[in-house]
């Protein structure tokens, strides 16, 4: 018996029912060129059935799987086609339209939807499903956590209604019906959404940004132009308003708009500071009334937080700066206008480093006059005594030579500036002065005796 006949006999012997024969023909596919195509999974009638194949219709091991992969024992309604999505009759339809699970998806994929036109995506990469209801989370936040697997409709951001709730609020730019006298048309831009960067809150009276465009220039905002505005410096905005007030071509007024959710609780951080680091992602309410409570002139040169109800910051009041910056919980308000036409008085600003002249701590205590000074005054020499007193006062007033004054005060007051020699021998002038003083004393004693007699 040849080997071919033996293989045929073995194969026919392994077939136990007509269903196996039908199964074999079903697993054998013929293409347009009448070329036989082998089955993607092996048929092993004598082995146990692959449980994963029976449950999902595919096998991760492919031809190397050692178990049997019968098509007749598949659950009712499951029809597996290679390179196609599975059809599972009785299961809910897979509504993604771009199934990333492929043959392992447990939902039904009807033929009329398989191979249909591709799913359209918006500018954010989210699916647009015409006929389905809009995704509520996307309409509120501008994001979708399910991505391409979401079964709801995600329209383009510019087609959403601008209700202030979406982070990507965009709308068209209708022009006002009446033109200006100079032939220019006003275009009202929608309000900007709440920014995530903290900045000083300056309340504005207008809710929209007027922007005048000449028809001859043709400068119209493009469709879908984002209205999100970054954080701006209020001092720069005021300067821009002053500079643009003299121009008749363009008038720009920068405003800010804060969305609020009446059905949600108020943001405590926003109510205390006027800013919120989460921006549009914050789930709490940011009421507009909070912006109207702060006075419009609470500005300082380095844009520190102004907290009217809190005590004044000691560092800012004394030195003009605060090391804590925007995190300081005290008040840093200055009631002044940095762009006042009358000019800014420098005396109104706090001195960064106050300077006080140094005070001398060396105190001079003068000694009482000695009897020799009184004797000199009584002997008819007031000029020498007066000169000595003036010289002593000058020495007391001069702080640069304290040691010299102390040496002079330690000498005996004899009406002269001479000092004794190191060998303690008086010179001729000193001896002469001593003789004169002795004569004066003797004459004084004689005069007193004459008066007594």
Swiss-Prot record:
Domain of life: Eukaryota
Residue(s) carrying N-acetylserine: 2
Listed InterPro entries: Plant_ZF_CCCH, Znf_CCCH, Znf_CCCH_sf
Record carries keyword NAD: no
Entry GO CC: nucleus
Region listing for Disordered, in residue ranges: 1-47, 360-453
GO molecular function: DNA binding; mRNA binding; zinc ion binding
Zinc fingers (C3H1-type) by residue: 44-72, 95-112, 129-157, 261-289, 307-335
Gene3D superfamilies, A to Z: 2.30.30.1190, Zinc finger, CCCH-type
Biased composition (Basic and acidic residues): 17-32, 391-407, 441-453
Biased composition (Polar residues): 1-15, 360-379, 413-422
Keyword Zinc-finger annotated: yes
Alphabetical list of Pfam families matching this protein: zf-CCCH
Key words of the record: Acetylation, DNA-binding, Metal-binding, Nucleus, Repeat, Zinc, Zinc-finger
Subcellular locations according to the entry: Nucleus
Descriptive protein name: Zinc finger CCCH domain-containing protein 26
Organism: Arabidopsis thaliana (Mouse-ear cress)
């Amino acid at each position: 018996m040849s080997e071919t006949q033996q293989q045929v006999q073995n194969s026919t012997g392994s077939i136990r029912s007509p269903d196996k024969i039908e199964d074999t023909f079903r697993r054998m596919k013929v293409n347009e060129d009448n070329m036989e195509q082998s089955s993607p999974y092996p048929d092993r009638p004598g082995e146990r059935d692959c449980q994963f194949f029976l449950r999902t219709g595919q096998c991760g091991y492919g031809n190397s799987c050692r178990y049997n992969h019968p098509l007749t024992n598949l659950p009712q309604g499951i029809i597996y086609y290679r390179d196609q999505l599975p059809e599972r009759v009785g299961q809910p339809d897979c509504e993604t339209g771009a199934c990333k699970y492929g043959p392992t998806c447990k939902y039904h994929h009807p033929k009329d939807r398989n191979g249909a036109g591709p799913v359209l995506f918006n500018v954010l990469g989210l699916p647009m499903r015409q006929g389905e209801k809009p995704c509520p989370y996307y309409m509120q936040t501008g994001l979708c956590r399910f991505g391409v697997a979401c079964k709801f409709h995600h329209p383009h951001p510019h087609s959403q209604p601008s209700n202030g709730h979406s982070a990507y609020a965009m709308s068209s730019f209708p022009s006002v019906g009446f033109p200006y006298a100079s032939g220019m048309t006003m275009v009202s831009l929608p309000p900007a959404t709440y920014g995530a960067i903290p900045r000083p809150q300056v309340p504005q009276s207008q809710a929209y940004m007027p922007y005048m465009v000449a028809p001859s220039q043709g400068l119209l905002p493009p469709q879908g132009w984002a209205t999100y505005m970054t954080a701006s410096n209020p001092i720069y905005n005021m300067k821009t308003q002053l500079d643009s007030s003299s121009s008749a071509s363009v008038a720009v007024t920068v405003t800010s708009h804060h969305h609020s959710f009446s059905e949600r609780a108020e943001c405590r951080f926003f109510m205390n500071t006027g800013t919120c680091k989460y921006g549009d992602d914050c789930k709490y309410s940011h009421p507009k009334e909070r912006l109207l409570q702060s006075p419009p002139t609470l500005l300082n040169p380095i844009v520190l937080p102004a907290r009217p109800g809190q005590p004044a910051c000691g560092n800012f009041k004394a030195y003009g700066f605060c090391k804590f910056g925007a995190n300081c919980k005290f008040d840093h308000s200055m009631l002044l206008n940095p762009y006042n036409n009358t000019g800014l008085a420098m005396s109104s600003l706090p001195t960064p480093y106050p300077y006080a002249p140094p005070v001398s701590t060396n105190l001079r205590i003068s000694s009482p006059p000695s009897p020799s000074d009184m004797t000199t005054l009584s002997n008819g020499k007031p000029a020498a005594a007066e000169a000595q007193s003036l010289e002593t006062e000058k020495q007391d007033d001069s702080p640069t030579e304290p040691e010299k004054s102390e040496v002079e005060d330690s000498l005996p007051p004899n009406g002269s500036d001479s000092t004794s020699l190191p060998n303690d021998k008086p010179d001729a002038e000193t001896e002469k002065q001593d003789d004169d003083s002795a004569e004066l004393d003797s004459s004084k004693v004689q005069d007193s005796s004459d008066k007594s007699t």
